[in-house]
Curated annotation (Swiss-Prot):
Biological source species: Nicotiana tabacum (Common tobacco)
Protein name listed in UniProt: Profilin-2
Subunit organization: Occurs in many kinds of cells as a complex with monomeric actin in a 1:1 ratio.
Keywords, comma-separated and alphabetical: Actin-binding, Allergen, Cytoplasm, Cytoskeleton, Phosphoprotein
Effect of T114A: Loss of phosphorylation
Domain of life: Eukaryota
Gene: PRO2
Amino acid sequence: MSWQTYVDDHLMADIEGQQGNHLAAAAILGNDGSVWAQSTTFPKFKPEEITNIMKDFDEPGHLAPTGLFLGGAKYMVIQGEPGAVIRGKKGSGGITIKKTNQALIFGIYEEPVTPGQCNMVVEKIGDYLVDQGY
């Protein structure tokens, strides 16, 4: 299965069978910031934004004072799982980032998708990839 298939058929799929109820954007990036696959809606990001995200996985709390930036958009960092999951909020939407051994799984949501639904979608794929050795 290609990385793009994971994005298109899993991360961007309708949630709980509700047509049109899906993440706003998603991507799988290598831990070095290289894009493995992304939705057409995923924001163009700066390398230093990924560097800062990786630093927060290594040093939990690093992003809390400044916020998480992706594609120039600022997210307020909310409770995640230190070293494994970063969650952010921006208005009525937000972001979930799951770190695996080799990759970062990104999910960006807007209403009507809930934070919990985004977490479920992103973390499910992330956990699967960890189980597969990625």
